[in-house]
Curated annotation (Swiss-Prot):
CDD domains: NAD_bind_m-THF_DH_Cyclohyd (cd01080). One of its GO terms (cellular component) is cytosol. Belongs to the tetrahydrofolate dehydrogenase/cyclohydrolase family. It comes from Mycobacterium leprae (strain TN). Catalyzes the oxidation of 5,10-methylenetetrahydrofolate to 5,10-methenyltetrahydrofolate and then the hydrolysis of 5,10-methenyltetrahydrofolate to 10-formyltetrahydrofolate. It catalyses: (6R)-5,10-methylene-5,6,7,8-tetrahydrofolate + NADP(+) = (6R)-5,10-methenyltetrahydrofolate + NADPH; (6R)-5,10-methenyltetrahydrofolate + H2O = (6R)-10-formyltetrahydrofolate + H(+). Pathway: One-carbon metabolism; tetrahydrofolate interconversion. This is Bifunctional protein FolD. The gene is folD. Its EC number is 1.5.1.5, 3.5.4.9.
Length: 282
């Protein structure tokens, strides 16, 4: 018997219906939310991501604000564009699409984003608020994972969660979310320096794989009935694959597919952050 699918697409569609209603109410009160994006260069993947985000905006009535910049812009021009969106009253929240060209300092750019307009939840101030459990926009992927688990009735309180990956977009913020009193999980954060990874994953009630190593997590590393969330994406020849080997589906109780699991929720929680900023809930 195979695992139950944690369907991110169906869950996303439920959230989009709710967001459309909330955006309509905001628009009626004269506060239409606006999502801005700053995109530098001509990377096909980045352009595809940005197009998808603005297509999502159109579905729910959020205003799209695009700032597409050439690959050879100066640091000063990038910073001026950030300041322009900081001051733009039509822009409720925005993102700087990563990665930036190597000659541009990503951390310096992100620090210039107004924390009150940080749609990604990755500004240092907002990450600090996450540590303190004070209100702030939450990192979209980590928030999406938590919502997906709740949507399928996965018990979190008192469980042992093993997160593979310590990145700032997934691993670290997810660990902070799961150890809040409202979740009360016990978290082990693993990474490239972890010895005997399988010994830890076999103890886990929930495993989140977010390192971008193709099929890193195999069936012999998973306790029967465990919940497995596949976040990492890698390109192998002509196709995209996740961190979780297909044989895990025969052992685990629940598995999120990849693609189609967490990815759709990352995008929809970007919109959710913007709507909540417009509502004054952050």
């Amino acid at each position: 018997m195979g695992a139950i699918t944690l369907d991110g697409k169906a869950t996303r569609d439920e959230i989009l219906i709710d967001l459309k209603q909330r955006v309509a109410a905001l628009t009626e009160s004269g506060r239409t939310p606006g999502l801005g994006t700053i995109l530098v260069g001509d990377d096909p993947g980045s352009h595809a991501y940005v197009r998808g985000k603005h297509a999502d905006c159109a579905k729910v009535g959020i205003t799209s604000i695009r700032r597409d910049l050439p690959v050879d812009i100066t640091t000063a021009v990038l910073h001026d564009t950030i300041e322009e969106l900081n001051a733009n009253p039509d822009c409720t929240g925005y993102i700087v699409q990563l990665p930036l060209p190597k000659y541009l300092d990503e951390n310096t750019a992100l620090e210039r984003v107004d924390p009150a307009k940080d749609a990604d939840g990755l500004h240092p101030t907002n990450l600090g608020r996450l540590v303190l459990s004070t209100p702030a926009p939450l990192p979209c992927t980590a928030r999406g994972i938590l919502h997906l688990l709740r949507r399928y009735g996965v018990e979190i309180a008192g469980t042992h969660v093993v997160i593979i990956g310590r990145g700032v977009t997934v691993g670290r913020p997810l660990g902070l979310l799961l150890t809040r009193r409202s979740e009360n999980a016990t978290v082990t954060l693993c990474h490239t320096g972890t010895r005997n990874l399988a010994a830890l994953t076999k103890q886990a009630d929930i495993i989140v794989a977010a390192v971008g190593v193709p099929h890193l997590l195999t069936a012999d590393m998973v306790r029967p009935g465990a919940v497995v969330v596949d976040v990492g994406v890698s390109r192998v020849e002509t196709r995209l694959v996740g961190d979780v080997h297909p044989d895990v589906w025969e052992v685990a109780g629940h598995v999120s597919p990849n693609p189609g699991g967490v990815g759709p929720l990352t995008r929809v929680f970007l919109l959710t952050n913007v709507v909540e900023l417009a509502e004054g809930r952050q």
